[in-house]
Amino acid sequence: PPFFFNDTATTETYTLSLHDALPIYDAITGVKNVTRSDDAWAVDPLLPESMRVDNSWHTNDGFDRGHLCASDDRSFSTEANKQTFYFSNMSPQLNSFNGGYWVTFEQLLNSWVRKDNAFGSVYDKIYVAKGGTLDKLLIDYKGTKAGGDGVMPATDSKGFTSKGLPVPQYYFIAVLAHRANQPVDIATSYQTIGFWVEHRDDYGYTFEHPLNRDDTKANAISIDELESKTGIDFFCNLPDYIEDEVESSYNLTDWAW
């Protein structure tokens, strides 16, 4: 799939890089003004033509076009919502995982940033990095449940779909929250949490009967552990003395489930 290996490309609402996208939630992005633009799939204009993926890469392969940055996370404007349907934001996901398991994490994160609830009113900014592992792929995978297109999903000996897209074995989420009206230069103003989620089709959940939010706690880990698993230095713009402290541990009771 297309990535910038030695550079990044950034717009007002998203960043393209080798490893991750960094959706930023604040007083602007945490509001909901528009609804999802279903099936508004589009090529990302920031990508060089040689790196672009279009819809033909995502059809008749048994996998969903799974959002990394969720559509509902970019509902403050029509343009921002359309950007979530760029193929640079899509990852091949098993149908039951996308619609019944991963969606619960999307809904959980979304609930944290809404200003009309107790948790969202405490934090003025929440930073989220999401992605799939490209060094750990679903190799020689043979699905037992057909995808939304009616095709049985499968990958080759390298972990690629029939159309040539890599299928992550794990998905990850890193979250950093900053308390409103608190100094930006002290560690107690921040809290972090990570999630490490195995990509499987046997969780037994559906869109109508998704994972209970409380059960997402089983996937929670510290940012330090997530960095060890992914090789990514999350939230590296924090001063080291803050980063070292807030990434070393997490407290489940600090978050609203």
Where are these regions (language model features)?
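Active-site acidic/histidine clusters and adjacent loop/turn architecture
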Residues: 21-25, 31-39
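Residue-level detector of intrinsically disordered, flexible termini
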Residues: 8, 26, 39-41, 153
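Domain-level detector of nuclease and nuclease-like folds
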Residues: 49-257
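Active-site-proximal segment of RNA-dependent polymerases
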Residues: 34-52
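Right-handed beta-helix
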Residues: 1-8
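A short, polar/proline- and glycine-enriched secondary-structure boundary/capping micro-motif
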Residues: 30-36, 204-209
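Short, small-residue-biased leader/transition segments that mark boundaries at the very start
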Residues: 9-22
